[in-house]
């Protein structure tokens, strides 16, 4: 499975989605930008996409939700360690209230992995961040065993981008 991302105006992203109704696409609206996400086992219809291979997934992406993309630049030598960590994740997030889906994305021609999660709304995501499941998933952060303490894994600082879909979910209104 692959995910392709492209950016443009809200109008163009919506028209592209409407043109390809048989494809699994979700329009995401963020701070000052709009992204069209295409999930497929085949080729994309985008002319200049950002390409990702899905390493791990759970749940079905929904056209009505709150998307959180944790963008993590990883060095070439750090890829095996980083991927191993995510292949052994606890999978506790799937049981959190408001959780819809997760995709762990390996970049095809770039260095930035994306951990994409979809929630019913921002309050669900924020509740997860204060949950025991979150603390368990991040318990080694900052310790000698934490992946963040290993030299040369990350090529630069990670950053988070958030998006909503055109149809507002109940707790994003």
Regions found by a protein language model. Give the residues of each.
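Short amphipathic alpha-helical segments
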Residues: 9-20, 77-101
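Catalytic "initiation/cleavage/transfer" segments centered on a nucleophilic residue
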Residues: 155-173
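An amphipathic, aromatic/His-enriched active-site/gating alpha helix that lines ligand/cofactor pockets
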Residues: 14-33, 40-52, 94-100, 122-156
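Short, well-ordered beta-strand segments in beta-rich or mixed alpha/beta enzyme
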Residues: 1-7, 28-41, 67-72, 105-131
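A short acidic, often aromatic-flanked loop/helix-cap motif at beta-alpha or helix-coil junctions
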Residues: 32-34, 44, 59-60, 166-170
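Non-catalytic surface loops within mature trypsin-like serine protease
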Residues: 74-76, 121, 164
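General small-molecule cofactor/ligand-binding pocket signal
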Residues: 103-105, 161
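Surface-exposed beta-loop interaction hotspot
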Residues: 45-83, 88
């Amino acid at each position: 499975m692959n995910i392709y991302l492209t950016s443009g105006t809200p109008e163009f992203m919506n028209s592209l989605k409407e043109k390809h109704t048989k494809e699994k696409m979700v329009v995401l609206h963020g701070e000052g930008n709009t992204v069209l996400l295409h999930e497929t086992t085949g080729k994309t219809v985008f002319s200049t996409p950002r390409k990702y291979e899905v390493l791990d997934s759970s749940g079905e992406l929904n056209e009505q939700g709150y998307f959180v993309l944790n963008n993590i630049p990883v060095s070439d030598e750090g890829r095996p360690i980083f991927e191993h960590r995510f292949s052994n994740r606890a999978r506790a997030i799937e049981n959190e209230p408001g959780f819809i889906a997760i995709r762990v994305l390996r970049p095809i021609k770039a260095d930035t992995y994306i951990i994409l999660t979809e929630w019913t709304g921002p309050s669900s995501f924020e509740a997860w961040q204060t949950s025991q499941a979150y603390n368990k998933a991040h318990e080694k952060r900052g310790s000698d065993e934490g992946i963040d303490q290993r030299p040369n894994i990350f090529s630069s600082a990670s950053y988070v981008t958030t998006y909503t879909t055109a149809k507002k979910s109940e707790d994003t209104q």
